[in-house]
UniProtKB/Swiss-Prot annotation:
Pathway: Amino-acid biosynthesis; L-isoleucine biosynthesis; L-isoleucine from 2-oxobutanoate: step 3/4; Amino-acid biosynthesis; L-valine biosynthesis; L-valine from pyruvate: step 3/4. This is Dihydroxy-acid dehydratase. It comes from Histophilus somni (strain 2336). Binds 1 [2Fe-2S] cluster per subunit. This cluster acts as a Lewis acid cofactor. The modification N6-carboxylysine is found at residue 124. HAMAP family: IlvD. Belongs to the IlvD/Edd family. Its EC number is 4.2.1.9. The keyword Magnesium applies. Its cofactor is [2Fe-2S] cluster; Mg(2+). Functions in the biosynthesis of branched-chain amino acids. Catalyzes the dehydration of (2R,3R)-2,3-dihydroxy-3-methylpentanoate (2,3-dihydroxy-3-methylvalerate) into 2-oxo-3-methylpentanoate (2-oxo-3-methylvalerate) and of (2R)-2,3-dihydroxy-3-methylbutanoate (2,3-dihydroxyisovalerate) into 2-oxo-3-methylbutanoate (2-oxoisovalerate), the penultimate precursor to L-isoleucine and L-valine, respectively.
Length: 611
């Protein structure tokens, strides 16, 4: 029988000092011997996805104590990628993921906590906490803040749905008036919650459902809806149950590594491909798998991307549907149900509810269950009222969307495409692979050949695009923006958005060793590995070189002879694989990150061989 970790600081005369301090936090005599459960919150007023989380920690804590645990809350940092976008702040986004993972480890191990409830929401917070949970391997439940409602506004006598990306694109479009641009800006982000499309934050929160580490509805139920409160309450109750099963019954099946197995990672990646999720999820799943000591690699992603169809298209891949529509269609359990019926899911993996994912689908998939309460839950919809308050409305759709032929979520037979929403490409310019969100690529440019136009930084690329240097037919190459070369692997949402603003969204490709926002669509290929700073061939591309892209055949090639490439490599060896004439201030903290960072194909985690 495993001993409570917290007994280290609560039992024995030699821990009198620690107990005295515990008492000063409010613990009573009968609390010693109960599991101490860390409530890992991420409230901040900087981030709309976290601005409503201030009281969520104590909501969960009260439920933990109601069912027999001792709850202790602490906070992590949280970076808003949208606000950090387009300037030096973006260098800090990806490194913050690892900092969050470390900070959770520090707090939990320093205080000998027995279990965790992780209250996350936005881009790097969920992955950072996920890495920590798999590293620590103590009972853990994830519950996120929930998605934002989609923005809505009236243009040309039509009501259209909006999100953050629309504000970015229209703001840079010279053909859009100031009044219309401001109208879109004011309407794009109406409520608290993670941005309303299938961007990185929502993608990751959905993947925690597929991994089995969060409750059904976690990825899709709106932040503003009263139903979301039940997820927080259920998380508090469930973590106490997991503690009892592990510490009192020696049931190791409740531990994160027992739940998030290789098969569960396959399920999560299959979900990501099926829903056309953010390419950032690839980075984060690779990183989380390493923490779980699971052998999940780019080869697995390639394998799955060749067989899993695209079953759901959500913004930014279409403006018709946002997360509120995914929830109405049955949420993640509905997509997993369609994958299961197509024979594309490992249905025996376990979940925090103590059942298999197959059993969970049978209970929560609206196509399988007649449970009125579950159908009511998935009818939870938007109110269309600007607010920063959680649980502030209880509006419902009249019906669920169970149309699997023409609805938001499709069956395999009626898939948006039989080819999945994400693909891994490889070739001489990306020997270790690169990633493209095929769900966001127009069919007319699935095969593309063009002349390279090379930029040594995102900032230069933005200037080149807005200044008219980039023309139709170009392959925009942005290099030295990888984990090591940035350092920090910036998102390239502004370059991709500005290509659309300039009318080049379907006329150009973009290739980078950096990464993309979950809001990116178009022929945008990221995570090129090895990155330029690690000696990757993207570092030797010159203006005018032909780059051929073939998504159906998963190939990308730099059309330069081996003799010429050898000469260019030798030249870069002498120069140290550094960007030419780039002026960028890099802090000591970022230099440390860059020194240890691996390329994207390894999840941009720290290179353990350097320690």
């Amino acid at each position: 029988m495993p001993k409570l970790r917290s007994a280290t600081s609560t039992q024995g005369r030699n821990m009198a000092g620690a107990r005295a301090l515990w008492r000063a936090t409010g613990m009573k005599e009968n609390d010693f011997g109960k599991p101490i459960i860390a409530v890992v919150n991420s409230f901040t007023q900087f981030v709309p996805g976290h601005v409503h989380l201030k009281d969520m920690g104590q909501l969960v804590a009260a439920e933990i104590e109601k069912f027999g645990g001792v709850a202790k809350e602490f906070n992590t940092i949280a970076v808003d990628d949208g606000i950090a976008m387009g300037h030096g702040g973006m260098l800090y986004s990806l490194p913050s993921r690892d900092l969050i993972a470390d900070s959770v480890e520090y707090m939990v191990n320093a205080h000998c906590a027995d279990a965790m409830v992780c209250i996350s929401n936005c881009d790097k917070i969920t992955p950072g906490m996920l890495m920590a949970a798999l590293r620590l391997n103590i009972p853990t439940v994830f519950v996120s803040g929930g998605p934002m409602e989609a923005g809505k506004t009236k243009l040309s006598d039509q009501i259209i749905k909006l999100d953050l990306v629309d504000a970015m694109i229209q703001g840079a479009n010279p053909n859009v008036s100031d009044d219309v641009s401001e109208q879109i800006e004011r309407s794009a982000c109406p409520t608290c919650g993670s941005c309303s499309g299938m961007f990185t934050a929502n993608s990751m929160n959905c993947l925690t459902e597929a991994l089995g580490l969060s409750l059904p509805g976690n990825g899709s139920c709106l932040a503003t809806h009263a139903d979301r409160k039940q997820l927080f309450l259920a998380a508090g109750k469930q973590i106490v149950e997991l503690c009892k099963r592990y510490y009192e019954q020696d049931d190791t099946s409740v531990l994160p590594r027992s739940i998030a197995t290789k098969e569960a990672f396959d399920n999560a990646m299959s979900l990501d491909i099926a829903m056309g999720g953010s390419t950032n999820t690839v980075l984060h799943l690779l990183a989380a798998a390493q923490e779980a000591e699971v052998n999940f690699t780019m080869a697995d992603i390639d394998r799955l991307s060749r067989v899993v169809p695209c079953l759901s298209k959500v913004a930014p891949n279409t403006q018709k549907y946002h997360m509120e529509d995914v929830h109405r269609a049955g949420g993640i359990m509905a997509i997993l149900g369609e994958l299961d019926r197509a024979g594309l899911l490992n249905s025996q993996t376990r979940t925090i509810l103590g059942m298999s994912i197959g059993e969970q689908i049978a209970k929560y998939d609206i196509k399988l269950t007649q449970d009125k309460a579950i159908h009511k839950f998935f009818r939870a919809g938007p109110a269309g009222i600007r607010t920063t308050q959680a649980f502030s409305q209880d509006c419902r759709w009249d019906t669920v969307d169970d149309d699997r032929e023409n609805g938001c979520i499709r069956s395999k037979e009626f898939a948006y495409s039989q080819d999945g929403g994400l693909a891994m490409l490889s070739g001489n310019i990306a020997l270790d692979g690169c990633i493209v969100k095929t769900a966001g690529v127009d069919e007319s440019i699935l095969k593309f050949s063009g002349k390279a136009i090379v930029f040594e930084s995102q900032e230069d690329a933005v200037s080149g695009i807005l200044g008219g240097k980039v023309q139709a037919g170009h392959v925009v190459v942005i290099r030295y923006e990888g984990p090591k070369g940035g350092p920090g692997m910036q998102e390239m949402l502004y370059p991709t958005s500005y290509l659309k603003s300039m009318g080049l969204g379907k006329a150009c490709a973009l290739l980078t060793d950096g990464r993309f926002s979950g809001g990116t669509s178009g022929l945008s290929i990221g995570h090129c590995s090895p990155e330029a700073a690690a000696g990757g061939l993207i570092g030797v591309v010159k203006d005018g070189d032909i780059i051929e892209i073939d998504i159906p055949n998963r190939r990308i090639e730099l059309m330069v002879s081996e003799e010429e490439l050898a000469e260019r490599r030798a030249e870069q060896d002498k120069l140290g694989w550094k960007p030419a004439n780039r002026q960028r201030e890099v802090s000591f903290a970022l230099k440390v990150y860059g020194y240890f960072a691996t390329s994207a194909d390894k999840g941009a985690v720290r290179d353990k061989t350097k320690i």
